[in-house]
Curated annotation (Swiss-Prot):
Motif DEGH box per record, residues: 472-475
Main location group: nucleus
Residue numbers binding ATP: I346, P347, L348, T349, G350, L351, C352, K353
Name of the molecule in the record: DNA repair and recombination protein RDH54
UniProt xrefs under Pfam families: Helicase_C, SNF2-rel_dom
GO MF term list: ATP binding; ATP hydrolysis activity; DNA binding; DNA topoisomerase activity; DNA translocase activity; helicase activity
CDD domains associated with the record: DEXHc_RAD54, SF2_C_SNF
Xref: InterPro entries: Helicase_ATP-bd (IPR014001), Helicase_C-like (IPR001650), P-loop_NTPase (IPR027417), SNF2-like_sf (IPR038718), SNF2/RAD54-like_C (IPR049730), SNF2_N (IPR000330), SNF2_RAD54_helicase_repair (IPR050496)
Gene of this entry: RDH54
Superkingdom, natural source: Eukaryota
Documented EC number(s): 5.99.1.-, 3.6.4.12
GO BP annotations listed: double-strand break repair via homologous recombination; reciprocal meiotic recombination
Residues covered by the Helicase ATP-binding domain: 299-487
Species whose genome carries this gene: Saccharomyces cerevisiae (strain RM11-1a)
Family: Belongs to the SNF2/RAD54 helicase family.
Length: 924
C-alpha cells in the first residue's frame, strides 16, 4: 500500500462508503491492489474469496502451485548461516521458478514457505550460488525432470499451502456487498485495518472415545506413510540385499560404491555379519553354491546373538568387509519409521551413528587409509588420536567425538590408548552403537584390563576380527565367545562342566582307548560347534587362489655347524634334566635357549637361562666368537641370489631382535640396503617405514620382528619372504608369512622356511603342522581335518623328551617320519590306511574287564606303534601336495634363485619340501 507524504493539515473525518470522491483504480492480476490515499479515503479493488461478497487478502506469500506447465521445480538444501569450518545442511526442500518471473521461491520439505530470492545474473552458476531466503542460506541441488518427481513435489507443497481447513487467525475479511454506481467495492480506511478474527467452532460437549468415529484398520493403513530403501535395487547390477525380520519396513542394500568391489566370499561375509549384528537366525541354505546375496530372506530373530566373530584367514579382506558393514549401518536402517526420513520416505540416517574401532597401534594408520581408499574421507568422518596429543587432549577429542553428531562417525583407537580414555567412553557409552575389535584374539585373557574395559562399555553390537582365535585352550575360547555374545555358553562353571572337561578328557592320551570318554567328548564337541557356528565365520585362504598370483612354499632343512652340535651337547649336559618331573612350562627357558643355538651360537652368552643354570665361561667365550650357523649361511646365499638374479624385494622375519641384529650386520657388510621394524620402533614411524619400503625401489630388504610387527602389515612391495625361525604358536608365523601374499600383490610369491636339521627347529615345525587341529575343528575347516585329529593331544611327555634330542645322522627327521622315498622331486600319493579301524579295535580290547601282564605289555607296544603311525599320518596330511627333494639326487627346487644357488648350498641344505604355486588367472 502506498502512503502519501504527510502534510500538516486540519483533521477531517473519513467519509462513509458510497461517497463519490474515491479514486478508482484499474483492477490488476495481483492478489492485493491499493490506491494512494486522497482526502483520507481509499478505493480498493478486492478479490472474491467466497460468493457471498468481496474479500480482501493481505497475504503476500507467493503461490507457485498453479497448474502452469512452465513452472520449473528444483530440490534444495538449506541451513542457518554459520561460521563453522565444516558446514552441514540442516534440511531439504523444494524451489519453484515460473517462466514469467526471475524470482525463486523456496519451501522446506513440508511445503512451508522459506523465502524467495532473485535469480543470479549468470545462469551457469545457478547451482553454485548460495541464496539468501529469510534467515536461511539455500543452495539448489538439482532440477526435477521426471513427471513422477514433479508430481511428488507438487503434492508435498500442496499439503501445506493448499490446506482447505481455515486457519485460526484469518487474513481475509468478508466485506458487505455494497456497490456504488460505478460498481466499485469501497470501505473506509479504519475498517481496512480492523480485521475480524474467525474463531473455530468449539463443541459444548466434551469429546470422548465413545463419541469418536472408529476408522477401519484398512483405512488407517492406506494412509500410512510409505518408506523406500536408500538404493533402488532395480538400478544396481548384482546388488547385495540384506536379510530382515518381519518387522522391517524397508530393504537394506549395500552401497554399490563398495558392492561392486566385493568378491563372492566377501559378499557372503558382509551379509553374515549383518545377520549376526541384527540378531537374525541363520537361514537354511540347501545349495551353498547358489548365490543368495542378491535376495533378502525374512528370518526369525535370535535373541542370543548380537555379535559376530569373523575368523577368516589372513588376506581374505576382513577390513574391507568390516568397512562395508560399517558404512551400511551408518547410512541405512530397516526401521525407517524410527529415524528421520525425506519427504519421499527414504531414511536420512542409519541404525548406527557412532562406531568404535579398536586395533593394535600399528594398524591405526592402515584402517584410516582403507576408509579413505574405499569410501573417501569426505563421505565418512574418521577420527584417530594423534600420538603427539597429551592425555587431556585425547580425552577432549573422545568427548567431542561422542557429543558432536555430524563431524565424525568412526573413532579408531589402539588397545593401549583405550585404557587412558576409558573414563570418557564410560560416561557416554550409550552413544556408541557398535564396536569393532581387530586382532580380537588379544582379548583371550579374561583378566585383561583391556577386555574388562570393553565389557564395561556394554556395547550391544560387537564385531571381532581375527585370523586365529583359538589354538588349544577352551578357556580362552570361552572368554572370547562370552565377550561377543554374553551368556550364550552359560556361566564358566557350567561351560567347564559340560564342554571343557569331557573334551579335554577325550583328548588326553591316557584315555585314547576309552570308548565311552571319546564318544562323550565327540558329542560335546559337535554340540559346541552347533552353538558357535551361528555367529562364527571361518574361511581359509584357499579361496584366494583364483584372485592372487601363485605362491610357492619351500621348507629348507639346513645342516647345523659343528660348533652348534657342540653347543647342544654342552647345554643338555649342563642342564641336568630330570625327565621324570619335566613339564613344558618348566623347560620353556631351555627350549628358548636351544632355539637360539639353531639361529646362531653367538646368542647363547646373553641368554638368561644359560647364565642362571649353566654358566660355563670357557664355552661361553667360544660361542660368542662363533656367529655363523647353517641357517645364516643359507640365508645370506639366498639374499645374494635374489639381489643378483631378480629385481624383487625380500622380507626377512625372525622372532628375536637379537637375531635381527646379527642379520642386519651381515646385510650391512654385504652392502644390502634395508629397513627394519620391531618393537623398538615408535608407532608413529611404522607407517612411514612400510610406505617407504613399498614405494622406494632402492630398498632391497625389510627386517621384521614377527611378534611386534608381523600383524596386519601390508608389504606387497616384496614378493619373497624368508622365515628365519619358528614360533610355538603357528598363528605368529602364518601372520608373518601372509604379509606379502595378499591383495595388491602383482608378482608370484616365494615363501622360504629355514629349519635346522635334526634339532629343536624340526620338533617345533612338526608341532606346528598338527597344532591347528582344534582350531580347524571349532571354526569349521571340516574339509581340512581328519575326524580323529582332534581326539588326541599330539605331543605327550615322551614327545617333550624328544625335543631335547639331536639327530645328527638324518637328512630330515620330518621326512623320516612320514616317507621312505628317495627324494627325487615327486609328489607322493599316500594310500588310505586302516588306522581308524585299528584305533577302534584297540579301544574295544582295552575296555575288557581283566588283562594279564603279558597281554597288557603287548597292548602297550601296539599302542606305542599306533601312536607313531597316527603322528606320521597327521604330518603327511599337513604336507600334502609338497614335493620331496633330496639335493644330493635332485637339484630342481622349482625356484630359479635357489636352483642357481645349489652349487654353493649343496653342503648346507640336506632336504627340502616344495609346494609349487599353480598359475592362477586373476579375476577381472
Amino acid at each position: 500500500m502506498q502512503i502519501p507524504k504527510y502534510e500538516n493539515k486540519p483533521f477531517k473525518p473519513p467519509r462513509r462508503v458510497g461517497s463519490n470522491k474515491y479514486t478508482q483504480l484499474k483492477p490488476t492480476a495481483t492478489a492485493v491492489t491499493t490506491a494512494p490515499i486522497s482526502k483520507a479515503k481509499v478505493t480498493v479493488n478486492l478479490k472474491r474469496s467466497i460468493s457471498a461478497g468481496p474479500t480482501l487478502n493481505l497475504a503476500k506469500k507467493p503461490n507457485n502451485l498453479s497448474s502452469n506447465e512452465n513452472t520449473r521445480y528444483f530440490t534444495i538444501m538449506y541451513r542457518k548461516p554459520t561460521t563453522k569450518k565444516h558446514k552441514t545442511w540442516s534440511g531439504d526442500g523444494y524451489a519453484t521458478l515460473k517462466a514469467s518471473s526471475d524470482k525463486l521461491c523456496f519451501y522446506n520439505e513440508a511445503g512451508k514457505f522459506l523465502g524467495s530470492s532473485m535469480l543470479p545474473s549468470d545462469s551457469d552458476s545457478l547451482f553454485e550460488t548460495l541464496f539468501k531466503a529469510g534467515s536461511n542460506e539455500v543452495q539448489l541441488d538439482y532440477e526435477l525432470k521426471e513427471n513422477a518427481e514433479i508430481r511428488s513435489a507438487k503434492e508435498a507443497l500442496s499439503q501445506n499451502m493448499g490446506n482447505p481447513n481455515p486457519p485460526t487467525t484469518s487474513t481475509t475479511e468478508t466485506v458487505p456487498s455494497t456497490k456504488n454506481d460505478g460498481g466499485k467495492y469501497q470501505m473506509p480506511l479504519s475498517q481496512l485495518f480492523s480485521l475480524n478474527t474467525v474463531k473455530r467452532f468449539k463443541s459444548v460437549t466434551k469429546q470422548t472415545n465413545e463419541h469418536m468415529t472408529t476408522v477401519p484398520k484398512t483405512s488407517q493403513n492406506s494412509k500410512a506413510k510409505k518408506y523406500y530403501p536408500v538404493f533402488d535395487v532395480n538400478k544396481i547390477d548384482n546388488p547385495i540385499v540384506m536379510n530382515k525380520n518381519a518387522a522391517a519396513e524397508v530393504d537394506v542394500i549395500v552401497d554399490p560404491l563398495l558392492g561392486k568391489f566385493l568378491r563372492p566370499h566377501q559378499r557372503e561375509g558382509v551379509k553374515f555379519m549383518y545377520d549376526c549384528l541384527m540378531g537374525l537366525a541363520r537361514p537354511t541354505i540347501e545349495n551353498p553354491d547358489i548365490d543368495c546375496t542378491t535376495k533378502s530372506l525374512v528370518l526369525e530373530n535370535d535373541s542370543d546373538i548380537s555379535g559376530c566373530l569373523l575368523a577368516d584367514d589372513m588376506g581374505l579382506g576382513k577390513t574391507l568387509m568390516s568397512i562395508t558393514l560399517i558404512w551400511t549401518l551408518i547410512r541405512q536402517t530397516p526401521f525407517a519409521s524410527k529415524v528421520s526420513c525425506s519427504q519421499s520416505g527414504i531414511p536420512l540416517t542409519g541404525l548406527c551413528k557412532k562406531i568404535l574401532v579398536v586395533c593394535p597401534v600399528t594398524l591405526i594408520g592402515n584402517w584410516k587409509r582403507e576408509f579413505g581408499k574405499w569410501l573417501n574421507l569426505s563421505r565418512i568422518g574418521v577420527l584417530t588420536l594423534s600420538s603427539r596429543n597429551s592425555p587431556d587432549m585425547d580425552k577432549m577429542a573422545v568427548r567431542n567425538f561422542l557429543k558432536v553428531q555430524r563431524t565424525y562417525q568412526v573413532l579408531i583407537i589402539g588397545y593401549e590408548k583405550l585404557l587412558s580414555v576409558s573414563e570418557e567412553l564410560e560416561k557416554n557409552k550409550h552413544l556408541i552403537d557398535m564396536l569393532v575389535c581387530d586382532e580380537g584374539h588379544r582379548l583371550k585373557n579374561g583378566a585383561s584390563k583391556i577386555l574388562n574395559t570393553l565389557k564395561s562399555l556394554d556395547i550391544r553390537r560387537k564385531l571381532l576380527l581375527t585370523g586365529t582365535p583359538i589354538q588349544n585352550d577352551l578357556n580362552e575360547f570361552f572368554t572370547i565367545i562370552d565377550f561377543i555374545n554374553p551368556g550364550i555358553l552359560g556361566s564358566f562353571a557350567s561351560f567347564k562342566r559340560r564342554f571343557i572337561i569331557p573334551i579335554t578328557r577325550a583328548r588326553d592320551t591316557a584315555n585314547r582307548y576309552n570308548e565311552e570318554l571319546l564318544e562323550k567328548g565327540e558329542e560335546r564337541s559337535k554340540e559346541m560347534i552347533e552353538i558357535t557356528k551361528r555367529f562364527i565365520l571361518r574361511r581359509t585362504n584357499a579361496i584366494l587362489e583364483k584372485y592372487l598370483p601363485p605362491k610357492t612354499d619351500i621348507i629348507l632343512f639346513c645342516k647345523p655347524y659343528s660348533q652348534q652340535i657342540l653347543a647342544f651337547k654342552d647345554i643338555l649336559q649342563g642342564a641336568r634334566l630330570d625327565f621324570g618331573r619335566l613339564t613344558f612350562s618348566s623347560s620353556l627357558g631351555l627350549i628358548t635357549l636351544l632355539k637360539k643355538v639353531c639361529n646362531s651360537p653367538g646368542l647363547v652368552g646373553s641368554d638368561p637361562y644359560y647364565k642362571s643354570h649353566i654358566k660355563d665361561t670357557q664355552s661361553q667365550d667360544s660361542y660368542s666368537r662363533s656367529l655363523n650357523s647353517g641357517k645364516l649361511r643359507v640365508l645370506m646365499t639366498l639374499l645374494e641370489g635374489i639381489r643378483k638374479g631378480t629385481k624383487e624385494k625380500v622380507v626377512v622375519v625372525s622372532n628375536y631382535t637379537q637375531t635381527l641384529d646379527i642379520i642386519e650386520n651381515l646385510m650391512n657388510m654385504a652392502g644390502m640396503s634395508h629397513c627394519r621394524l620391531d618393537g623398538s620402533i615408535p608407532a608413529k614411524q611404522r607407517d612411514s617405514i612400510v610406505t617407504s619400503f613399498n614405494r622406494n625401489p632402492a630398498i632391497f630388504g625389510f627386517l621384521l620382528s614377527a611378534k611386534s610387527g608381523g600383524v596386519g602389515l601390508n608389504l606387497v612391495g616384496a614378493s619373497r619372504l624368508i622365515l628365519f625361525d619358528n614360533d610355538w604358536n603357528p598363528s605368529v608365523d602364518l601372520q608373518a608369512m601372509s604379509r606379502i601374499h595378499r591383495d595388491g600383490q602383482k608378482k608370484p610369491c616365494f615363501i622360504y622356511r629355514l629349519v635346522t636339521t635334526g634339532c629343536i627347529d624340526e620338533k617345533i615345525l612338526q608341532r606346528q603342522l598338527m597344532k591347528n587341529s582344534l582350531s580347524q575343528k571349532f571354526l569349521g575347516d571340516s574339509e581340512m581335518r581328519n575326524k580323529e585329529s582332534s581326539n588326541d593331544d599330539l605331543f605327550n611327555k615322551e614327545d617333550l623328551k624328544d625335543l631335547f634330542s639331536v639327530h645328527t645322522d638324518t637328512k630330515s627327521n620330518t621326512h623320516d617320519l612320514i616317507c621312505s622315498c628317495d627324494g627325487l622331486g615327486e609328489e607322493i600319493e599316500y594310500p588310505e590306511t586302516n588306522q581308524q579301524q585299528n584305533t577302534v579295535e584297540l579301544r574295544k580290547r582295552s575296555t575288557t574287564t581283566w588283562t594279564s601282564a603279558l597281554d597288557l605289555q603287548k597292548k602297550m607296544n601296539e599302542a606305542a606303534t599306533n601312536d607313531d603311525a597316527k603322528k606320521s599320518q597327521y604330518i603327511r596330511q599337513c604336507l600334502v601336495h609338497y614335493k620331496h627333494i633330496d639335493p644330493a639326487r635332485q637339484d630342481e627346487l622349482f625356484d630359479e634363485v635357489i636352483t642357481d644357488s645349489f652349487t654353493d648350498l649343496k653342503d648346507s641344505i640336506t632336504f627340502a619340501f616344495v609346494k609349487p604355486g599353480e598359475i592362477c588367472l586373476r579375476e577381472q
